[in-house]
Amino acid sequence: MDVFTVAAAIAITLSAVVIVVYFLHTTQPSPWSKTKQRLAYTRKVIPKKRKLPFKSLEHLILNSLDDFLPMEEETTVQDVAKFFARRGNEFSVYSIDWEQDVVVLIRPVDGADLKSNPFFRQAQRRNAAEVLCVPLEQLQEVASAVADEVAHVQEVFIFMTGRCGSTLVTRLVEATSVAQAVSEPDVFSVISMALHRLKRSSQHGQTPSHLGCPAVLSNEESTIALLRNVVTLMNYTLVTSDPRHRDVIFYKLRVETILFADLMVRAIPSAKTVFMYRNGLEVTESFNRALLQQSYVLYKVFRWGMVFLDLLHPDFFKYFGDDPRFSTVRQRGKGLFMLFAFWVGTMQCAADLQKRQPRHFFHAVIYYSALLSDKKKTFRLQMKKLGLKWSPEEPGEDTDKIKKALDEDSQAGTSLCASARKPGEKWAPDVSSRWMGQWEREYFREVCHCTGNEILGPDFLLPGTIV
């Protein structure tokens, strides 16, 4: 890079850091109580506006009760089980507030279609009109009240590396008559982050009582019960609010949730699982392009530093990056390392799950190139592997909806769309020159080498992959 380019990049970087520091230091105190709640309650809310240096950073911030400003007074719900059985089609699980010790559900504004957005968590946050907060101590009672209504539901959990076509698959599923899909409900990531922090602190010799650890996460049995109950509530909301009452539900989970995938299937033993992935260098480049708004100059500056990412969300990229196995890697803790470690760690988890629990992991394994080659054929094969009978030619299928899902950019209109397409615009492959070269490939192999001799590079393939 020439001196002017370097100067411009440094100026942009410093500006971003200043904005983030300002954002962090001007954050207003939370208007919500930070003490344990004994009774369920509802309260009208309006979404807060987030001020971020890059819009794409919103995808790194977990949903929380503090996303909203409370309006009016809260209303106590004396019999929350009966309330949810009657109005559960209106409220969807949003997050968990560990300080109030409640599961947070939201009711959207009238007429909002939360599943029309490529990311369910984002649609929930932007359209919330009211919250329902259920004490964790009462969650089992609420789940039991509706469990029989959704006992027949078939869950499908999609685990993935990110940037691999998983959003497209959820759009296709939602276009069918046989199943519905939810793209990245954030409550599972909230649980994953809490479990990760607990594990990391425990490795440093701290016991749960000294961590302020949520009691529900103090042992596997209660954690599994929490997951089961959350899924039950989500199933009830989705089935009862769906005009066709489709009872096969695909849950596309965020990347880090693979860390407790074994707990997910212990909570829901009948669930089917899918793993979707892509070449590690391609995943990293695609993420960088979206995050940095296609600026190669910023990529060159940021690849050796997390900068504002560390300030905004210090734990996100450390799910795998703080693994002691990577202690000998050059530039450990820097930006490119963290992204590479995220992919390598995810793939190692997937490989281990396949070997340890082949009955549960995975019923279908999809590589990005298969979708690029033939979306419809690959999707059809995935449905077959999951035991679902589906054909776009079957009576009752909306061929226009399916064609739209196949043709349009599934992330258009969101900040994670690397090409900044608007909703409804068609997808097209990126033909611009690559950011990742020989140096990145060699460094990627160095990161891979730390995990052993199984994953040798970014082009590693799992057994049974549809390519």
Question: How would you name each of these model-derived features?
Answer:
Residues 1-147, 315-337, 344-367, 372-467:
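PAPS-dependent sulfotransferases, especially Golgi type II membrane carbohydrate sulfotransferases
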Residues 22, 26-29, 46, 187-218, ...:
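PAPS-dependent sulfotransferase catalytic domain
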Residues 149-151:
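P-loop NTPase catalytic core of nucleic-acid-dependent motor ATPases
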Residues 153-155, 246:
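Pre-Walker A (Motif I) flank of P-loop NTPase domains
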Residues 156-176:
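Glycine-rich phosphate-binding P-loop
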Residues 157, 168, 233, 260-263:
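Short, hydrophobic/aromatic alpha-helical segments in well-folded domains
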Residues 175-183:
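Post-Walker A helix-loop "phosphate-sensing" segment adjacent to the P-loop in P-loop NTPases
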Residues 211-253:
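Intrinsically disordered, low-complexity, charge-dense segments enriched in Lys/Arg
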